[in-house]
Amino acid sequence: MCQKNILFLVADDLRPNLGSYDGANDGIFKQPPMHTPNIDALASKSLVFEKAYDSMALCSPSRTATLTGRRPDTTRITRIGYYWRDYGGNFTTIPQFFREKGYWAVGAGKVFHGGPSSGNDHIMNCDCDYSWDVCPYHDPPDGYPESGDVSWKALDKATLDEAPLQDQKNTKWLLPKIRDAAKKFKEEDTPFFVAYGVHKPHTPW
């Protein structure tokens, strides 16, 4: 039986108003669907989950819960800056599981919460020793003040061309890796697990 290749996409602070979900249509929160043609096209030929539950309304605990399949009370991660393998247990992650099944695992961007939350002081370290064949690329943005309250709308194309943000840099790094993964699959029959975590629509920093 041929193993399927896997593309695992993570968005940061994305609302549920996607066209593929017909907007947020639950009572008082009903809003019109956003214009999301690319996601909708992907959803039309994908398995779309219609029930999802937030384990915790904080980045690192919720990512840890998603990637390990365990609740924050099990991982013991309820805030940012703590590594679940040190506090909760040596739990297997989604990319680690596929890697152990023979998949080639590579990622870029904000998949895990980088830095101390993933076992290292550096933002680039994202559980590298366990989960990946190639340590994910997650580079900080160039040439911007460290500000968490600036909209993406404040950044024009000329500015972004001169000083790319993380999503642009991560995409540029990951595309050749996806080509390598496709080549390995074709020549060696090695399936791949590719994860990409975008910062949009979170504020750019």
Residue ranges, per PLM feature:
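Formylglycine-dependent sulfatase
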Residues: M1-W205
